[in-house]
Amino acid sequence: MLLSQTRGRLPSTLRSFSRRALSTTLPRGKDSEETALNKVSRNVTQPISQGASQAMLYATGLTEEDMNKAQVGISSVWYNGNPCNMHLLDLSNRVREGVQKAGLVGFQFNTVGVSDAISMGTKGMRYSLQSRDLIADSIETVMGGQWYDANISIPGCDKNMPGVLMAMGRVNRPSLMVYGGTIKPGCARTQNNADIDIVSAFQAYGQFLTGEITENQRFDIIRNACPGGGACGGMYTANTMATAIEVMGMTLPGSSSNPAESKAKDLECLAAGEAIKRLLKEDIRPSDILTRQAFENAMIVVNITGGSTNAVLHLIAIADSVGIKLDIEDFQKVSDRTPFLADLKPSGKYVMADLHNIGGTPSLLKFLLKEGVIDGSGMTVTGETLAKNLEKVPDFPADQKIIRPLSNPIKKTGHIQILRGSLAPGGSVGKITGKEGTRFVGKARVFDDEDDFIAALERNEIKKEEKTVVVIRYTGPKGGPGMPEMLKPSSALMGAGLGSSCALITDGRFSGGSHGFLIGHIVPEAAVGGPIGLVKDGDTITIDAEKRLLDLDVDETELARRRKEWEALRDAGKLPQTGLTMRGTLGKYARTVKDASHGCITDSVE
């Protein structure tokens, strides 16, 4: 008899049940009944003592039969102010439809999001990385407070993906991710109908400043770069993380390359219901999938595809959520043995929609598995191993030009390089594809704010004939605060034709859309007294990717003098403001965030 059918009667069996303590954890055990799927939600749907909980659930439209079903929290990062996210409510509705058809109860809820592209180059960018941890916190909060048995998350923009994975790792209940999907390429009518994307819009600014394009061409680019819903199209951060998460096994096959507006994405959403039911039946949790080997596969694929440097701190943070220690040197070890094969933007020619047309991520992973580059033994959200998932996947067409063969790589080793030295004793992350060379020596031009750099560029103060290392500092996780991305400065440099004569280093981050000679994630950051805060205009800086060095050519005596000067300015309150003196959400973030080499996590107990 269902509890809801007692109508005031209290049989002895139920009196006994109502006094029995129900565990709030997820014990592993054998239970052949269908109700075994609701191991968590039955803490509120079954006990007589939780009648008020049940009354609230009936008010949502649940039936008496529904009270015995597993409940799935469907968390979407939907908001209509960003193309990466504006379609996610539609996808969430389709996911719920699939969940209900699978005989489960689907409850939809939302979490926060920040558009990197809209906030880029403004103070709004300070909220971007912080949103990753807010997403994780909010999903964890709802999953814990509402007693849902499983989670399906639907992210779209850059920080969404690691945020939902961190929540899945913390909660550790059966979970899977449905990626919102990639946008279609745009088309520039004034440039022979060339394919364009969001990075084209960023670079158009520098091209306009130098007279390479007219105002009419510039407007044509920004008006047509983004033709609809979906994440930015190249191997930028969103597609990088989605691809990494697919190879780790936390999505259904093809999720990372299925375009946002496609039948394939629609079918994927519907299939998520049966997939999550199998995970519940077999008690497969994120901790069973997100193993050390899964993270090895992810690091390999990030290097193979020329993916975003943001993957370094995001994968470290996701690993931390499941108790796996990943550090920046792990990325270097993988990079040293992994070739760069993908001719994908930002450094290459093609976008994710092009990869989808030749078989997508599944065909890429099959190619890598056949070549022995990745390990296929790990469990995935299908309930099968990665290798099993790839058995019937078609090979790439013989004439495809997007993914190079191992015998003819773009670069024999990976593009992600971990550099240390007198400027970055705690590490830094370089994005070195080889096109910009592997060594750069130049004179420092220092800016405490990216707006000051843009103003200098507009005044034509950065000369093409001079080797310059642009230093943008006080942009770290505590200093920014929020470790904003430097896509606007890096794109402006490239657009202005300064990519070969200028390098850019920062204690902030770079967008997945950035390319050029770029070093970010410098630890320690300027706000906490890192050496980058001691650099002055005219100092010689050496970047050597082969020796993995980031050095400041200033003797120890002079550095000691500068440090005393810096400390005096700090004590007098004359340094740039950091998050450490702020209130509100950014101040709270600055006081809890770890450095970039430790993933910028905010829930550390150390």
Curated annotation (Swiss-Prot):
Function: Dihydroxyacid dehydratase that catalyzes the third step in the common pathway leading to biosynthesis of branched-chain amino acids. Catalyzes the dehydration of (2R,3R)-2,3-dihydroxy-3-methylpentanoate (2,3-dihydroxy-3-methylvalerate) into 2-oxo-3-methylpentanoate (2-oxo-3-methylvalerate) and of (2R)-2,3-dihydroxy-3-methylbutanoate (2,3-dihydroxyisovalerate) into 2-oxo-3-methylbutanoate (2-oxoisovalerate), the penultimate precursor to L-isoleucine and L-valine, respectively.
Transmembrane segments: none
NCBIfam families assigned to the protein according to its UniProt record, in alphabetical order: ilvD (TIGR00110), PRK00911.1 (NF002068)
Localisation: Mitochondrion
The organism of origin for this protein: Aspergillus fumigatus (strain ATCC MYA-4609 / CBS 101355 / FGSC A1100 / Af293) (Neosartorya fumigata)
Protein name (Swiss-Prot/TrEMBL): Dihydroxy-acid dehydratase ilvC, mitochondrial
GO cellular component, one term: mitochondrion
Protein residues bound to Mg(2+): 116, 158, 485
Family to which this protein belongs: Belongs to the IlvD/Edd family.
Cited Pfam families: ILV_EDD_C, ILVD_EDD_N
Keywords for this protein: 2Fe-2S, Amino-acid biosynthesis, Branched-chain amino acid biosynthesis, Iron, Iron-sulfur, Lyase, Magnesium, Metal-binding, Mitochondrion, Virulence
The protein's annotated pathway: Amino-acid biosynthesis; L-isoleucine biosynthesis; L-isoleucine from 2-oxobutanoate: step 3/4; Amino-acid biosynthesis; L-valine biosynthesis; L-valine from pyruvate: step 3/4
GO terms assigned for molecular function: 2 iron, 2 sulfur cluster binding; dihydroxy-acid dehydratase activity; metal ion binding
Signal sequence region: none
Example GO biological process: isoleucine biosynthetic process
Catalytically driven reaction(s): (2R)-2,3-dihydroxy-3-methylbutanoate = 3-methyl-2-oxobutanoate + H2O; (2R,3R)-2,3-dihydroxy-3-methylpentanoate = (S)-3-methyl-2-oxopentanoate + H2O
Tagged with keyword Amino-acid biosynthesis: yes
Regulation: DHAD activity is inhibited in dose-dependent manner by 2-hydroxy-3-methylbutyric acid with an IC(50) of about 8 mM.
Entry binding sites for [2Fe-2S] cluster: 84, 157, 232
Domain of life according to the entry: Eukaryota
